[in-house]
Amino acid sequence: MGGLVEDMLMLARLDEQRPIERGPVDLLSLAADAVQDARIVAPSRTIDLTVGAGVAFLVLGDEARLRQVISNLMTNALTHTPNGSPITVRVFAGQQQGKPPVPCAVLEVTDHGPGLTPEQASRVFERFYRADQARGRRTGGSGLGLAIVEALVTAHDGTVSVDTAPGQGATFRITLPLAPDALAVEPAAD
């Protein structure tokens, strides 16, 4: 119950358009942490991280809130992907629409769950919406996780979308503008 109240309070703060704290955040590092956390929670699951080359995935934002975005997407994928099916997290460079286009970091979380109908996909970011009401009751989902993702990504001047079809799983994609100096920084070699 406490988590639900916290989620509702966060959405209320975002509705009031309170500014978020912005500092340099390494999106790749957050993604790697989320994958590692998911592997600990679900050690029998295959969870892969793939990374595009060419830029440091440095964005300006609130690290704790961006960590929550990725955590919500990972929790959603773990909840809806059957055992034995992989989950893939990809981080790569892209461009947001605009004039001129804005260089951005793209993070995708792909699951192999039941997928969504077009009507469900159009509503999946609504507050309290659950595509599968029975599953929500079983897993205890509030229907706020993806609404929080959308609100937080929007507050970071980013976009969120879903590509899905029934029986085909889903890919949730967030794009966040790169920090001005991200293009000049080469990512660290592992």
Task: Give the role of each language-model region.
Residues 77-78:
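Short helix-loop "hinge" at the ATP-lid/N-box region of the Bergerat-fold HATPase_c
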Residues 23-24, 48-57, 92-94:
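Conserved catalytic submotifs in the C-terminal HATPase_c
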